[in-house]
């Protein structure tokens, strides 16, 4: 074929692509569609979004376009919701219509499929309901909300305090030890075991989980999700989710070992055994979500999400204690008055410790570790704040805009525990406190996270006073965004009280 013949073909292809592009963006011209930056042909707004610092980028777009604005990521329509009113209207008022998740094509690399969607990214439907119900009931049966699980956490808190004491007041980074303690609680629930803090496989698993988290954001990831045909190019597909794949491989080894010790005649000791029991019941049912492929995804969901979010919040808590020693002293005084320095903290103590409870909540608000939540998708046309959002639109809930809303919080950009105290010093929780999101897809691990945060935090401050190491500069209170917002690396000294 000569060059002359290729020119008309190229023109035809270009016209076809432009027509397809116009079809995908035609809703922008619909009445009451949210405003937003003008998308480029083919790319949409991919070049307008800084995926390395998305929360800041969205804040700038909010100032320009308002609380409800639209984006076009290649051919994927996206609406970003900002502020308490818009977020609650979408997730609570229209809870049934916004409970779906958008397809995430790159998760096929990890083994996601119609029968293996896990819990967190599962489409809204029978499989999600089945797994959500199973996860909640199993965690409850394993002791969530009961004294038995509380004892697991307090035992692990004692191990964590012993590990802190081993540093003998010398400077160290606390993040690794916090990861290990929180992960052991999750490992006990999912796999019925705890690991020693120096176990090589445990260290490898935690390292892969942390590195995998960084793969949850970035320009290439967004491009591959927006244009999934590019996943057929091995050179591109091989560059994403490498650590998450390695994490699942490591988890597969643990699950294989665990299955060898499972006795179906005995009551389940952990979530994995409960899942295996459901698999036995579901044999012969091709529609069931209880299968080998989904087991690894469900356990990975609970393990990685349950570990990273809570340990990151605790890391923020210790950072804020060394930056605000006056707050630290008030927490310790309340611990001494209510618990003392010998007895282990209990969840029953929380009702008598309003200041400590306020501090923990303010750590969550200020740390703002999941600023953009997890994406939702509309399953039918809805209206939010007067704007019409069509069926099939991806929704991003800017939780950071709620947790740091200047119209709600007295000092939104400062650490201020009094946000959660009334004039009499009683604990109060404003409606805008949404670190676990809201609606039907709110975090199912919230009760466990609240227990761990209280017991680990109070145990550490009961035993240690924390400070900035002598001669070191004052650490930054600015976070680092990589889907989660983690504290900038810092060291502290833990001096026994």
Swiss-Prot record:
Disulfide bonds listed in the record: none
> Domain of life here?
Eukaryota
Q: What effect is documented for mutating residue 296 to C?
A: In allele CYP2D6*2, allele CYP2D6*12, allele CYP2D6*14, allele CYP2D6*17, allele CYP2D6*45A, allele CYP2D6*45B and allele CYP2D6*46; significantly reduced monooxygenase activity toward anandamide; slight decrease of monooxygenase activity towards bufuralol
Q: What is the effect of changing residue 343 to G?
A: In allele CYP2D6*25
- Impact after mutating residue 169 to R: In allele CYP2D6*14; poor debrisquone metabolism
Q: Which residues bind substrate?
A: 301
Q: What catalytic reaction does the record list?
A: (5Z,8Z,11Z,14Z)-eicosatetraenoate + reduced [NADPH--hemoprotein reductase] + O2 = (8R,9S)-epoxy-(5Z,11Z,14Z)-eicosatrienoate + oxidized [NADPH--hemoprotein reductase] + H2O + H(+); (5Z,8Z,11Z,14Z)-eicosatetraenoate + reduced [NADPH--hemoprotein reductase] + O2 = (11R,12S)-epoxy-(5Z,8Z,14Z)-eicosatrienoate + oxidized [NADPH--hemoprotein reductase] + H2O + H(+); (5Z,8Z,11Z,14Z)-eicosatetraenoate + reduced [NADPH--hemoprotein reductase] + O2 = (14S,15R)-epoxy-(5Z,8Z,11Z)-eicosatrienoate + oxidized [NADPH--hemoprotein reductase] + H2O + H(+); N-(5Z,8Z,11Z,14Z-eicosatetraenoyl)-ethanolamine + reduced [NADPH--hemoprotein reductase] + O2 = N-(8,9-epoxy-5Z,11Z,14Z-eicosatrienoyl)-ethanolamine + oxidized [NADPH--hemoprotein reductase] + H2O + H(+)
Query: Under which name does UniProt file this protein?
Result: Cytochrome P450 2D6
Which organism encodes this protein? Homo sapiens
């Amino acid at each position: 074929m000569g060059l002359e013949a290729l020119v008309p073909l190229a023109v035809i292809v270009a016209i076809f692509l432009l027509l397809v592009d116009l079809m995908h963006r035609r809703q922008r011209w619909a009445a009451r569609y949210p405003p937003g930056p003008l998308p480029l042909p083919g790319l949409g707004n991919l070049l307008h979004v800084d995926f390395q610092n998305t929360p800041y980028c969205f804040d700038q777009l909010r100032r320009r376009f308002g609380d409800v604005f639209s984006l076009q990521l290649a051919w994927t329509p996206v609406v970003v919701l900002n502020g308490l009113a818009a977020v609650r209207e979408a997730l609570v008022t229209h809870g049934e219509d916004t409970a779906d998740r958008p397809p995430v094509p790159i998760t096929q690399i990890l083994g996601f499929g119609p029968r293996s969607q896990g819990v967190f990214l599962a489409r809204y439907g029978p499989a999600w309901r089945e797994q959500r119900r199973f996860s909640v009931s199993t965690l409850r049966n394993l002791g969530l909300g009961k004294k038995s699980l509380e004892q697991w956490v307090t035992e692990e808190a004692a191990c964590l305090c012993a590990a802190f004491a081993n540093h003998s007041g010398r400077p160290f980074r606390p993040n690794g030890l916090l990861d290990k303690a929180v992960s052991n609680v999750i490992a006990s629930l999912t796999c019925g075991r705890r690991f020693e803090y120096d176990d090589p496989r445990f260290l490898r698993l935690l390292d892969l989980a942390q590195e995998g988290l960084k793969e949850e954001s970035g320009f290439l990831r967004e491009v591959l999700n927006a244009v999934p045909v590019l996943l057929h190019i091995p050179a591109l597909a091989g560059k994403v989710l490498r650590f998450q794949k390695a994490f699942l491989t490591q988890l597969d080894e643990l699950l294989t070992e665990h299955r060898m010790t499972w006795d179906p005649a005995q009551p389940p000791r952990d979530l994995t055994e409960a899942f295996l029991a459901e698999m036995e019941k579901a044999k012969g049912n091709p529609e069931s979500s209880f299968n080998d492929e989904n087991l690894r995804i469900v356990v990975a969901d609970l393990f990685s999400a349950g570990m990273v979010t809570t340990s990151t919040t605790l890391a923020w808590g210790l950072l804020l204690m060394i930056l605000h020693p006056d707050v630290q002293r008030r927490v310790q005084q309340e611990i001494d008055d209510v618990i003392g320095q010998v007895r282990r903290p209990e969840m029953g103590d929380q009702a008598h410790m309003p200041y400590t409870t306020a501090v923990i909540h303010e750590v969550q608000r200020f740390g703002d570790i999941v600023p953009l939540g997890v994406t939702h998708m509309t399953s039918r046309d809805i209206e939010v704040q007067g704007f019409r959002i069509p069926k099939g639109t991806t929704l991003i809930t800017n939780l950071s805009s709620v947790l740091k809303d200047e119209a709600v919080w007295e000092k939104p950009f400062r650490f201020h525990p009094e946000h959660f105290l009334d004039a009499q010093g009683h604990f109060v929780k404003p409606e805008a406190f949404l670190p676990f999101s809201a609606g039907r897809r709110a975090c199912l691990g919230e009760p466990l996270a609240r227990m761990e945060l209280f017991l680990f935090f109070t145990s550490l401050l009961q035993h240690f006073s924390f400070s900035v190491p002598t001669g070191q500069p004052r650490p930054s209170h600015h976070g680092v965004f990589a889907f989660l917002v983690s504290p900038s690396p810092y060291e502290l000294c833990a001096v026994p009280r």
